């Protein structure tokens, strides 16, 4: 354990990111989001009115001072690659800054694609070694949060760790979806179980468990050794949570980093914000929260901007139709290029170029880019996928049986509508 003075911390906050490379694991399909990820990887899914999910990890890197980034892709990567090429070409090659796209290419012997999260890094080691980084920051590309990775790097150095795992308390009922750990008084991880059926509770709070966030800092040389050994282990599933972290824990080399120490938030008293948005309900709820009066995630913090690909779009427009009805919104996010004509939009998120025609009522809905809503529609508690054309007079979110028959309806009552579902519905109606 190294004790650092304030001046040392300030200096390290500048130096450590320059000695680091971030690897963003962005190849996941996100099957729990159902048809929303049929044609795009989960990190490429739209979020928050104008962003993609991966923009949060990329923005955290940029704001933390990490300007050497590798994005590891696999499933349905075209949309993701296109987004990064268009929106993240701001780095200077002359200053050794970059975002490298690392698609699965079966570089190593055999015909395997990425077998797990650790294998995704292993198969790119020939490229990663060329970065000559002292530290490797492993990130998931499908979470919504704001974090200063330089603070986590300082914690890693101060504790003398070879591996540091970001963690936060989660409700015990939700902990089955995470790696769960136990730590001692120095934050050394003394036990780690990936997605346990019966998660162990935190000492002093039986309602919560200490969960891994899938954010890791490694000494680079130590990581390379671990991955080389793991690649030769036929019994391994080649996954950080299932194999690598438990092994390091047994060797006494892993330390925990409490997320509140590096979480970036405008209100110091607020609960640290981190969302998986892995289910349709979580995705819908996290989007709508941004439209509330006091959202849990501050998207307006100029000191920690979330960047994305910016299209040249006209301002949103609210117009009065010929009948005299006004286009109105309440507690909603409305992006550029949207037109609301003689309709009411309440507690909803409208992505760019959404068109809502007259006499519609939109309530608690997430409308992705280029959605067109015909006249006299009522949409409630739903997610409408990109470029869907909602026919005139359609009602969604009011009749559970009808919604389940026509579209996908979650157990919580959130309705997902895609172009393919609408096409099939039209074919049925024409028969």
UniProtKB/Swiss-Prot annotation:
This entry's Enzyme Commission designation comes to 2.7.7.27
Give residues annotated as binding beta-D-fructose 1,6-bisphosphate.
Answer: 39, 419-423, 429-431
Q: What does this protein do?
A: Involved in the biosynthesis of ADP-glucose, a building block required for the elongation reactions to produce glycogen. Catalyzes the reaction between ATP and alpha-D-glucose 1-phosphate (G1P) to produce pyrophosphate and ADP-Glc.
* Name listed for the protein in its UniProt record: Glucose-1-phosphate adenylyltransferase
Q: Name one GO biological process term.
A: glycogen biosynthetic process
* Pathway annotation: Glycan biosynthesis; glycogen biosynthesis
Top-level EC class: transferase
Among its keywords, does the record have Nucleotidyltransferase? yes
Annotated InterPro entries: ADP-Glc_PPase, ADP_Glu_pyroP_CS, GlgC_bac, GlmU/GlgC-like_hexapep, NTP_transferase_dom, Nucleotide-diphossugar_trans, Trimer_LpxA-like_sf
How would you summarize its activity regulation?
Answer: Allosterically activated by fructose-1,6-bisphosphate (F16BP) and inhibited by AMP.
